[in-house]
Amino acid sequence: MVDVFTVLIVVIQNVYNMKLKIKVKVLAKGCMPVLNDVGDWIDLKSAVDMEIPAPQSGTLKKTTINGERIGHRDVELPVYYIPLGVAMQLPQGFEAIIASRSSGSKKLGLFIPIGQGVVDNIYKGNDDQWHYICSPMRETTIEAGDKICQFRIQLSQKATMWQKIKWLLSSGIELVEVDDLGNDNRGMNITGIK
């Protein structure tokens, strides 16, 4: 008779030796993300060259507050969607967080106006290209292939107990390049605000 404890050990060892696979369809040459041993996040690259102008301030407005004349200008920060040249299928029960690189604000003058971007698990179609949604602090130039942001995966709030255990026991993640993700396109920003 097979010892249940032995079977359990074998199952745990097999799960532990498993890596969570992220399928990646490369849409622009040179944009395949690369796992490296330095740092916990995965760099993403711009798929295009872009000239981004500095934000423009409006006309000077003067207001009197408590008898004091105060001048101010409204500044509009435009939002840019920089294509990252990849579409990905995350493992079930996971989502991705996109954030600026630590040097991004200083070197590129870009920031994410909402702090970070979230890529849901359902955004996994062949044409569901990831984007870096950002605003400029100054005029800047981006070239295709520049590392402009980074991402990591984490459990989603809908992750099952099995997906949580798999994450806990996995030996990391693996990026697998594919020609076809085999999923319907979800589109970007399609859910609206109402």
Which residues fall in each region the model found?
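DUTPase catalytic domain/fold
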Residues: 5, 10-194
